[in-house]
Amino acid sequence: MFRVCRRLYHPNTLEHAVGNRLRPLAYEQDSPQYKVLQRALEAHVPVLGFNERAIVRAAGDLGYGSAVLSALAAPNSPALLNVPSAVLELVKFHLVTKRVALADAAAQGNVSMEQLFLQRVEADRPLAGQLTQLLSILSLPGEFLVNTAMPELFRLSDDLIYYSGEKDHPDLAWYSKRAAVAMAYVSTNLFMARDRSPALEETLHFARRRLQQVDSLGTAYNNVEEFAWYQLLMAMNLVKSQLTRG
């Protein structure tokens, strides 16, 4: 497993090429799938949550029938623990499009890791009331966790480091730093799901503090890559345990 992950996550500028912007989505911005999922996220998920009702309503808004669910379900494995495949695609769409938006921000000029990290956190603000459900889906054991959730978390970490021009680390330390950034993002989402402060001020403060903790590791990114994956898995397990406690 770790050899496969090494190939996927070793630094590669092709990962940031314009032609690959929407990978691993299997459709473009002008496709019905993209339009329906975007509409669902913007208009219906904040109220209804990540479910088929949000997708069907979005499809209806745009003049598409409920048959769009079949097209959206195609790229994913059969439903896991009562989570429909189309809903898994909606979650994937959310993760990918919000990550891709970081490239647009970076194109405007020099940006820091903190600026990009906070932008990604802010992108989840409209869904704050649905983050508990989102994190539950992301942490479900199975193919979606291995093939989508964890790879997307690592792609997010990689993009944050790449676009901010952060000092990077070679070889094994490369994995550890990305695991730490991914953990910071996951824990910030978990905090936001329970934050009741005005304008989510405490979440933003928490996000800055977690990012500072990543920076404070400095040259300590010398753990083996298995430990990096272990740490991220522990973060996902922490999410599951916290969600179970309510």
Swiss-Prot record:
UniProt GO cellular component terms: mitochondrial inner membrane; protein-containing complex
InterPro entries: COQ9_C, Ubiq_biosynth_COQ9
GO MF: lipid binding
Pathway per the UniProt entry: Cofactor biosynthesis; ubiquinone biosynthesis
Keywords: Lipid-binding, Mitochondrion, Transit peptide, Ubiquinone biosynthesis
BP GO terms, sorted: ubiquinone biosynthetic process
Pfam families found in the cross-reference section: COQ9 (PF08511)
Record's subcellular location: Mitochondrion
Transit peptide endpoints, chain numbering: 1-58
Binding site for a 1,2-diacylglycero-3-phosphoethanolamine: Y175, S176, K177, R178
Chain's role: Membrane-associated protein that warps the membrane surface to access and bind aromatic isoprenes with high specificity, including ubiquinone (CoQ) isoprene intermediates and presents them directly to COQ7, therefore facilitating the COQ7-mediated hydroxylase step. Participates in the biosynthesis of coenzyme Q, also named ubiquinone, an essential lipid-soluble electron transporter for aerobic cellular respiration.
Family listed: Belongs to the COQ9 family.
Protein known as: Ubiquinone biosynthesis protein COQ9, mitochondrial
Protein's organism: Eremothecium gossypii (strain ATCC 10895 / CBS 109.51 / FGSC 9923 / NRRL Y-1056) (Yeast)
Lineage: Eukaryota, Fungi, Dikarya, Ascomycota, Saccharomycotina
